[in-house]
From Swiss-Prot:
GO molecular function annotations of the record: RNA binding; structural constituent of ribosome
InterPro entries, per the entry: Ribosomal_Su5_D2-typ_SF (IPR020568), Ribosomal_uS9 (IPR000754), Ribosomal_uS9_bac/plastid (IPR023035), Ribosomal_uS9_CS (IPR020574), Ribsml_uS5_D2-typ_fold_subgr (IPR014721)
Example of a GO biological process term: translation
SS bonds (residue pairs): none
Species whose genome carries this gene: Bordetella pertussis (strain Tohama I / ATCC BAA-589 / NCTC 13251)
Pfam families for this protein: Ribosomal_S9 (PF00380)
Organism domain of life: Bacteria
Family: Belongs to the universal ribosomal protein uS9 family.
Protein name: Small ribosomal subunit protein uS9
A GO cellular component entry from the record: cytosolic small ribosomal subunit
Keywords: Ribonucleoprotein, Ribosomal protein
């Protein structure tokens, strides 16, 4: 499968996406389903299409994605990051535009750990004065 495909790995929170692109008609398949079916919300589809719209390749590539882990938004972000890396693998001249838009940088925000003696990461137990 790797023959004439360009590859990119994308990550966001706990989601990991493996993205393969090749010249084609613009079909995007995520985990064996069309992108419209996999991402039910419009925001998820919009996030996935951003790097393609920016570079003007919305209907130039067939894209196969395998994504796992995390939730819907994290997976959409991981797919966007993977598509960006695959586009750079295809044509390095696209990197400045994608970098300017902030798609190349991996979003490093992760869930903060729960601390001992707290209810959540920062939420303390209720204080009773008396």
């Amino acid at each position: 499968m790797i023959g004439n495909w360009n590859y990119g790995t994308g990550r966001r929170k706990t989601s990991v996406a493996r993205v393969f692109i090749k010249k084609g008609s613009g079909k995007i398949v995520v985990n064996g389903k069309p992108v419209d079916e996999f991402f039910a919300r419009e925001t998820g589809r919009m996030i996935v299409h951003q790097p393609l719209e920016l570079t003007g390749h919305l209907e130039s590539f067939d894209i196969k994605v395998n994504v796992h882990g995390g939730g819907e938004t994290g997976q959409a972000g991981a797919v966007r990051h993977g598509i960006t890396r695959a586009l750079i693998d295809y044509d390095a001249a696209l990197k400045p535009a994608l970098s300017q838009a902030g798609f190349v940088t991996r979003d490093a925000r992760e869930v903060e750990r729960k601390k001992v003696g707290f209810r959540k990461a920062r939420r303390r137990k209720q204080f009773s004065k008396r």
